[in-house]
Amino acid sequence: MGVFVVLLSIATLFGSTSGTALGPRGNHSDCTSVDRGYQCFPELSHKWGLYAPYFSLQDESPFPLDVPDDCHITFVQVLARHGARSPTDSKTKAYAATIAAIQKNATALPGKYAFLKSYNYSMGSENLNPFGRNQLQDLGAQFYRRYDTLTRHINPFVRAADSSRVHESAEKFVEGFQNARQGDPHANPHQPSPRVDVVIPEGTAYNNTLEHSICTAFEASTVGDAAADNFTAVFAPAIAKRLEADLPGVQLSADDVVNLMAMCPFETVSLTDDAHTLSPFCDLFTAAEWTQYNYLLSLDKYYGYGGGNPLGPVQGVGWANELIARLTRSPVHDHTCVNNTLDANPATFPLNATLYADFSHDSNLVSIFWALGLYNGTKPLSQTTVEDITRTDGYAAAWTVPFAARAYIEMMQCRAEKQPLVRVLVNDRVMPLHGCAVDNLGRCKRDDFVEGLSFARAGGNWAECF
């Protein structure tokens, strides 16, 4: 395959809603779109935090998405999260245990709980599901179509972190990209298919800008867990009390409540290859409770990997410095988590490419977005009260790192400008940039954009890792 498998040991979201239960069923033909993402059950699925399937935020963008007529794109970097997956191993065990305890202890399972009588947990763990694979094929097609003046003749240089769901996501992106090209009568018919060019091992023995592992103090941090525990203690007991009243014989902890809520998104994305069937777990909770759940997951990521953790943003500094190198076509300067052996080799880190695609995990995307300063306007999130999306400066896990999340960093040349302009799109939302002078379309001059990444260029507070 020509893939470099590196084995080098070098180091609708927070707003309040009514308290009625939600139980819609979707039309599967309308559930997914290459350009708009997941379109079913938006009043619910947009409140699933990082377990939400990608949906376009174009309508929420403060700047227009279209490229002006007097400009043309000259460079694109896409950074994407893997597609929808089964729960992790530890979560799989926790979810199954909660369900088994209810089945064992409940003396009655009436009405909307009746499905639990014969429910058998069978989602597996860790890996992409068919819906997640389709999401990444759609991303490949979207990337091809959006930048077709380039993609008709140029292949992206593709990297992935070496976990099965991330690597497979990159492969599915390539597949979707090539399928779109083959359906384009204007494409170069002699252009070979792109491939996954570099797969970077994960773990504490490897420097890897697409997966955090080597910052010792960060890996030992409990800041995110503590924040999540604080808010869980605020909202979950009332839900547990309500459920216990409906389920005689059952006693539920706060963690049990969160486990049952998580079953809703995970099962929905696993039941069909387009997620058109809503899990019966979703009907067990009210709209107001889903608003609280969504905030919990956003809080967890903010304090775990974003601006709420003193060592969160620096986990993304290595990738930010790689972006600078690609934008400026100059060697990488970094002393954090960059793999210097890879990045010094033009075969594994070219500087002359036009299109780049990197694939990673949600947590890494959060750190990278903060290292880029995209959410510098987000103030510390309350650990006791739900804050509306307008108060978080556009940050929410469902808006930021849903399944198949994608950020596009575009560079464009415009007739009236001597220097190229840069803008950043997160899930189709053109981001208000910080640290550089932004024009009325959300763009900065490239050199100003790079200069504004002072936190990354200085290496952040990486020295505090050890």
UniProtKB/Swiss-Prot annotation:
Catalyzes the phosphate monoester hydrolysis of phytic acid (myo-inositol hexakisphosphate), which results in the stepwise formation of myo-inositol pentakis-, tetrakis-, tris-, bis-, and monophosphates, as well as the liberation of inorganic phosphate. Myo-inositol 2-monophosphate is the end product. Has a broad substrate specificity and is also able to dephosphorylate other classic acid phosphatase substrates such as p-nitrophenyl phosphate, phenyl phosphate, fructose 1,6-bisphosphate, glucose 6-phosphate, 3-phosphoglycerate, as well as ADP and ATP. Keywords: Disulfide bond, Glycoprotein, Hydrolase, Secreted, Signal. This is Phytase A. Pfam families: His_Phos_2 (PF00328). PANTHER family: 3-PHYTASE B (PTHR20963:SF24), MULTIPLE INOSITOL POLYPHOSPHATE PHOSPHATASE-RELATED (PTHR20963). GO terms for molecular function: 3-phytase activity; acid phosphatase activity. Belongs to the histidine acid phosphatase family. Residues 1-19 form the signal peptide. Glycans are attached at N27, N105, N120, N207, N230, N339, N352, N376. Monomer. Disulfide bonds join C31-C40, C71-C414, C215-C465, C264-C282, C436-C444. GO terms for cellular component: extracellular region. Its EC number is 3.1.3.-, 3.1.3.8. 1D-myo-inositol hexakisphosphate binds at Y51, R81, H82, R85, T88, R165, K301, H361, D362. SUPFAM superfamilies: Phosphoglycerate mutase-like. InterPro entries: Acid_Pase_AS (IPR033379), His_Pase_clade-2 (IPR000560), His_PPase_superfam (IPR029033), Histidine_acid_Pase_euk (IPR016274). The active site is at H82. It comes from the Eukaryota. It catalyses: 1D-myo-inositol hexakisphosphate + H2O = 1D-myo-inositol 1,2,4,5,6-pentakisphosphate + phosphate; 1D-myo-inositol 1,2,4,5,6-pentakisphosphate + H2O = 1D-myo-inositol 1,2,5,6-tetrakisphosphate + phosphate; 1D-myo-inositol 1,2,5,6-tetrakisphosphate + H2O = 1D-myo-inositol 1,2,6-trisphosphate + phosphate; 1D-myo-inositol 1,2,6-trisphosphate + H2O = 1D-myo-inositol 1,2-bisphosphate + phosphate. Its main location: secreted. It comes from Aspergillus terreus. It is an enzyme of class 3 (hydrolase). The gene is phyA. Optimum pH is 5.5. Active from 4 to 6.5.
